[in-house]
């Protein structure tokens, strides 16, 4: 399960790096499709930074944290981090929809990635707390396979 998180984290980091690159670029955005889909407008708007820090850089840091927590199997902290990321993504989505009236393809992909991570984190915590992990570990012990604690 944790490797699925890592794959999603890599996808989120890639789109965040692309958005960060675009934030500092003066060239036309490759994802500027029409007046409703323009990454350039979104990434150069006043909402693209928080206290001078690009939102895309915050995304990179968030995805990195989520990746580390997944690899360490820190389910509760992973769930908290993904819920915080989801709340931040919803805040940014609201700005795109209601304030700017323009969508960024990179941002929408990142929003989908953090939503998937959050759903997986919820599922992982529920699965683990249901006792399924303990039953799996007992079964593996019977057949001679071992797995580190925390599954």
Language-model regions, residue ranges each:
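Membrane-interfacial helix-loop segments of redox and metal-homeostasis proteins
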Residues: 1-149
């Amino acid at each position: 399960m944790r490797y699925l998180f890592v794959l999603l984290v890599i996808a989120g980091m890639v789109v965040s790096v692309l958005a960060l690159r675009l934030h500092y670029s003066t060239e036309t955005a490759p994802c500027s499709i029409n007046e409703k889909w323009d990454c350039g407008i979104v990434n150069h708007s006043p909402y693209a930074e928080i206290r001078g820090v690009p939102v895309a850089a915050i995304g990179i840091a968030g995805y990195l944290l989520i990746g580390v927590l997944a690899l360490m199997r820190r389910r509760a902290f992973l769930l908290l981090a993904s819920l915080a990321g989801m709340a931040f993504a919803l805040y940014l989505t609201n700005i795109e929809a209601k304030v700017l009236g323009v969508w960024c393809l990179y941002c929408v992909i990142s929003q989908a990635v953090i939503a998937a991570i959050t759903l997986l984190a919820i599922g992982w915590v529920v699965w683990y707390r249901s006792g399924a992990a303990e039953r799996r570990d007992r079964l593996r012990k019977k057949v001679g396979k071992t797995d580190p604690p925390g599954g």
